[in-house]
Regions:
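Short, compact, well-ordered microdomains
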Residues: 73-118
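Short low-complexity stretches enriched in small and charged residues
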Residues: 6-15, 54, 62-65
């Protein structure tokens, strides 16, 4: 029996920030628990509809992320509702990564990432 997730932002409250940008991956820590996004990165899209974007809070363990029950594929606009301050980053190319600093500003960490880890 499938379970229904109780998203922090109900569907009817979602705003339209972006259209037609594809889908992304995000865990329940963002969409259900409402913990602020602190790490985003973009990989090469795996399909026509994949934006390549991945969003995380930074609190997720490897075990948590390995459990498909706690992760989902969502329209990019849905996830951007949880961190609209990242909209200006969405046109960044694949193999780009950002994390928030102690002031909440996005810092480009693309050169600090071992991209082999993600594949």
């Amino acid at each position: 029996m499938a379970t229904t997730k109780n998203f922090k932002i109900p569907r009817e409250k979602l705003k339209t920030f972006v259209r037609g940008k594809g889908f992304c991956i995000a865990p329940d820590t963002v969409l259900v628990d409402g913990i602020p996004v602190s790490l985003i990165y973009r990989v090469m899209p795996s399909s026509l509809y994949d934006s390549g974007w991945r969003f995380f809070t930074g609190t997720e363990s490897d075990e948590y992320l390995a459990n498909a029950r706690y992760n989902g594929v969502y329209d990019l606009n849905t996830v951007v509702n949880y961190c609209p301050e990242a909209i200006h980053l969405l046109d960044s190319p694949p193999y780009t990564a950002f994390r928030r600093d102690e002031y909440g500003e996005w810092i480009n960490i693309s050169y600090d990432v071992d991209w082999r880890y993600w594949f």
